[in-house]
């Protein structure tokens, strides 16, 4: 799909389709009014007859409108003008693109980017439109033998901006959006891959592909032998029950061209989580292939980063592992020695993500990082607390937390900060080891982050719990690509190349 921007009046557009908005109740947007005037009231006459009310998401496709150069006009319901918000805007764009894809139009000029969305500028509207369009067109069908195809797939969409002065802003928005969308697609493709294909070795292969494709990237793989030498007893214990070797992929992006401190992203990469000896219930266990969503998100963010060619140093860590039951698996009651030297009593082998992450978080101390952000499908408690809309954010460093919250608002990939008070640390106490890997039934998301915080004393750190946001269940099951957009926005902001609100 090709995207671009232009600045022009609707009556001069010669296209397969021109897209304009209609508000509720039957109120034409400014662009639609111009088309109505040229067509001598053709559009407003249809609205008076009740063909379109203007409710959000309604679509009406018109052919051969009098005096209009374009073959088709697509009227898009945008709801009440004053109530159009970010969520509605994205939904409208997604439905518009899907509708266009079914009409047989191979290209279209879209004026929805001129709609007023409260508090948002043209950069945001164009970027969100491109990201939403790419998201709506995504399908994971690489393993299907029969693939559905649109009769004449949409190939090009042009978003209109109000003035020529805004063209450079719109062009930058398209450029940023395409890079981010590419990262999101990478994240989705890897996360959606079945666990018999996507194991830790597969994750490592994907990390190596980035090195092969981009000059500023180098990738190294830490195998179990090296983990043993490093004393990563916690990480190794989790993978002990699987025939698939645990592998940690280190992706280094040297964008600054100097020795400035890197930002480090650490992704939990449990390519399948059966729960181990503390076996999960059978219902929905197929979705535990998504327990590597953190690693997929970091890989996607690194892909977007290299596409954007940002002038900063970033390291992505994919902590690949598989948690399986076997005679060699670790057990409840085991006491593990982590890379940091701290000991952990295992109360439940299904609280394994933190055991992998704690050693990865200790490992990254060697990079003398500017900041470390770990990303993990860590706790079911986060799904209970925040549902599928907000990623859980916990941090021991207020400025970093505020940066991430700002990036989440800018990108529309929302997060919500939860407390990380010392009061919760007591729930991890153990009579036999330094602490346990489980904090009890209460405040599960917070106690999991409290556990991780004990391994992050040497740098500024934040934790993103994406258990509720990494994938969708049900009929439309699949990876969402989150939090690639938020992470990339954070990196854009850090590089000084952000644009927009």
UniProtKB/Swiss-Prot annotation:
InterPro entries assigned: Leucine_aapep/pepB, Macro_dom-like, Peptidase_M17_C, Peptidase_M17_leu_NH2_pept, Peptidase_M17_N
GO molecular function, one term: metalloaminopeptidase activity
Domain of life: Bacteria
Keyword NAD: no
GO BP: proteolysis
CC per GO annotation: cytoplasm
Catalyzed chemical reaction(s): Release of an N-terminal amino acid, Xaa-|-Yaa-, in which Xaa is preferably Leu, but may be other amino acids including Pro although not Arg or Lys, and Yaa may be Pro. Amino acid amides and methyl esters are also readily hydrolyzed, but rates on arylamides are exceedingly low; Release of an N-terminal amino acid, preferentially leucine, but not glutamic or aspartic acids
Primary localization: cytoplasm
Positions of the catalytic residues: 280, 354
Cofactor binding: number and manner: Binds 2 manganese ions per subunit.
HAMAP family registered for this protein in UniProt: Cytosol_peptidase_M17
Family: Belongs to the peptidase M17 family.
Protein known as: Probable cytosol aminopeptidase
Lineage: Bacteria, Pseudomonadati, Pseudomonadota, Gammaproteobacteria, Alteromonadales
């Amino acid at each position: 799909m090709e995207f671009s921007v232009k600045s022009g009046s609707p009556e001069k557009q010669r296209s397969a389709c021109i897209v304009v908005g209609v508000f509720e109740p039957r109120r034409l947007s400014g662009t639609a009014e111009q088309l109505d005037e040229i067509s001598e009231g053709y559009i407003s006459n249809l609205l008076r007859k009740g063909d379109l009310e203007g409710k959000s998401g309604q679509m009406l496709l018109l052919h051969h409108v009098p005096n209009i150069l374009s073959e088709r006009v697509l009227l898009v319901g945008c709801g009440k003008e004053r109530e159009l918000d970010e969520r509605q805007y994205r939904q409208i764009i997604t439905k518009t693109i899907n509708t266009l894809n079914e009409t047989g139009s191979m290209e279209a000029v879209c004026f929805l980017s001129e709609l007023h969305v409260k508090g948002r500028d043209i950069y945001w509207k164009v970027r969100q439109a491109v990201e939403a369009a790419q998201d709506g067109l995504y399908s994971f069908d690489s393993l299907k033998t029969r693939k559905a195809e649109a009769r004449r797939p949409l190939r090009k969409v042009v978003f209109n901006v109000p003035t020529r002065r805004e063209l450079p802003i719109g062009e930058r928005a398209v450029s940023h959006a395409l890079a981010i969308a590419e990262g999101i697609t990478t994240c989705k493709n890897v996360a959606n891959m079945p666990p018999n294909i996507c194991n830790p070795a597969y994750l490592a292969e994907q990390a190596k592909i980035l090195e092969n494709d981009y000059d500023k990237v180098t990738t190294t793989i830490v195998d179990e032998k090296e983990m043993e030498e490093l004393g990563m007893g916690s990480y190794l214990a989790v993978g002990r029950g699987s025939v698939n070797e645990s592998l940690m992929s280190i992706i280094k992006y040297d964008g600054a061209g100097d020795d400035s401190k890197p930002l480090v992203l650490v992704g939990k990469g449990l390519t399948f989580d059966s729960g181990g000896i503390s076996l999960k219930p059978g219902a929905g266990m197929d979705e535990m292939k998504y327990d590597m969503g953190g690693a997929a998100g970091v890989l996607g963010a690194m892909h977007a980063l290299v596409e954007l060619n940002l002038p900063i140093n970033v390291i992505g860590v994919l902590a690949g592992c598989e948690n399986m039951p076997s005679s060699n698996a670790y057990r409840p009651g085991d006491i593990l020695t982590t890379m940091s030297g701290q000991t952990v009593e295992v109360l439940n082998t299904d609280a394994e993500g933190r055991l992998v992450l704690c050693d990865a978080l200790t490992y990254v101390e060697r990079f003398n990082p500017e900041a470390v952000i770990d990303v993990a499908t860590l706790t079911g408690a986060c799904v209970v607390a925040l549902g599928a809309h907000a990623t859980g954010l916990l941090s021991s460093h207020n400025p970093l937390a505020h940066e991430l919250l700002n990036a989440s608002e800018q990108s529309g990939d929302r997060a919500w900060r939860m407390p990380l008070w010392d009061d919760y640390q007591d729930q991890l106490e153990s009579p036999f080891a330094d602490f346990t890997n489980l904090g009890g039934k209460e405040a599960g998301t917070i106690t999991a982050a409290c556990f991780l915080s004990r391994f992050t004393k040497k740098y500024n750190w934040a934790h993103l719990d994406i258990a509720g946001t990494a994938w969708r269940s049900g009929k439309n099951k699949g990876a969402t690509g989150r939090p690639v957009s938020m992470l990339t926005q954070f990196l854009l902001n850090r590089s000084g190349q952000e644009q927009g609100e």
